[in-house]
Amino acid sequence: MSQLMQLKDVAESTRLGPLSGEVSAGEILHLVGPNGAGKSTLLARMAGLTSGEGSIRFGGAPLEAWATATLAQHRAYLAQQQNPPFAMPVWHYLTLHQPDKTRTGQLNEVADMLGLGDKLGRSVNQLSGGEWQRVRLAAVVLQIHPDANPVGQLLLLDEPMNSLDVAQQNALDRVLHHLCQAGIAIVMSSHDLNHTLRHAHKAWLLKRGKLIACGRREEVLTPSYLAQAYGLRFRRLDVEGHPMLISAT
């Protein structure tokens, strides 16, 4: 897989770094670590929303050299929290994120995949927390979806599984896998280590802004590295052919 983004000595005040790493096209990378590890700070920096020490190159060019409108065509970003805007139907909110607003079929398809087919006529400010989270996810998927956006490359998600039940998480995993197969790089923060073991290609483990380990998921999510990050003892078990992490304390 070709490198899409390169980070070198990236740092922000006392919250992050310096850290270096690469993101490749078509891979799913999970950022894991305890609260306050710097995951949200790093994602916002990778999205081009903040600045600081070090350098980030995206698509062969310095991230700060990208015009805002052009960058939005190549990468989509889901913040951890966002309140609904003024009252508008769900379908209207989603249309605002589509590069090609005539592709109503694609909007309906993504909405159906995330269980929103019967919510399109509802106002966004009348949704439950889980419904609003899925609407936000559908919006960034539509923004970057390769069927309508041939230059889409990167999807950044800050705790996308928040407020989703097990079935909704599974539906999102299927959508992300489809995007990954199409060559989109996905970087997301996660607090579910076993989900990372099942679905990520690579993982970056952070603690207090420092990168403890990075690489393939099974190389990073080891009991020794996790003990450094969380201050707990972990065991890795095999359950019906699948690895599972449990706290041993």
Swiss-Prot record:
Keywords: ATP-binding, Cell inner membrane, Cell membrane, Membrane, Nucleotide-binding, Translocase, Transport
Gene: btuD
EC category name: translocase
Record's keyword annotation contains Translocase: yes
Tree of life domain: Bacteria
Name of the featured protein: Vitamin B12 import ATP-binding protein BtuD
Enzyme Commission designation: 7.6.2.8
Catalytic activity: an R-cob(III)alamin(out) + ATP + H2O = an R-cob(III)alamin(in) + ADP + phosphate + H(+)
General function of this protein: Part of the ABC transporter complex BtuCDF involved in vitamin B12 import. Responsible for energy coupling to the transport system.
Classification via Pfam families: ABC_tran (PF00005)
